[in-house]
């Protein structure tokens, strides 16, 4: 599955993280 930075960021923010980005096609969230 492809990882889209915008979708990842929205998903992470919705879970209470400050941001997120794609690394090796996986969404990683940041505090």
Curated annotation (Swiss-Prot):
The record marks 21 as: Basic residue of the functional dyad. GO terms for cellular component: extracellular region. The keyword Ligase does not apply. PROSITE patterns: SCORP_SHORT_TOXIN. It holds the Pfam family Toxin_2. Signal peptide: none annotated. One of its GO terms (molecular function) is ion channel inhibitor activity. It comes from the Eukaryota. Disulfide bonds join 3-22, 8-27, 12-29. Keywords: Calcium-activated potassium channel impairing toxin, Disulfide bond, Ion channel impairing toxin, Neurotoxin, Potassium channel impairing toxin, Secreted, Toxin. The record marks 9, 11 as: Crucial for toxin binding. Its main location: secreted. Expressed by the venom gland. The record marks 30 as: Aromatic residue of the functional dyad. It is found in: Secreted. Belongs to the short scorpion toxin superfamily. Potassium channel inhibitor family. Alpha-KTx 19 subfamily. Monomer. Has the structural arrangement of an alpha-helix connected to a beta-sheet by disulfide bonds (CSalpha/beta). Negative results: has no effect on voltage-gated potassium channels Kv1.1/KCNA1, Kv1.2/KCNA2, Kv1.3/KCNA3, Kv11.1/KCNH2, Kv11.2/KCNH6, Kv11.3/KCNH7, Kv7.1/KCNQ1 and on Kir2.1/KCNJ2. Selective inhibitor of high conductance calcium-activated potassium channels KCa1.1/KCNMA1. May be insect specific. This is Potassium channel toxin alpha-KTx 19.1. The lineage of its organism: Eukaryota, Metazoa, Ecdysozoa, Arthropoda, Chelicerata.
């Amino acid at each position: 599955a492809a990882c889209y930075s915008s979708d990842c960021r929205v998903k992470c923010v919705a879970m209470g993280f400050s941001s997120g980005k794609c690394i090796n096609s996986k969404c990683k969230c940041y505090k």
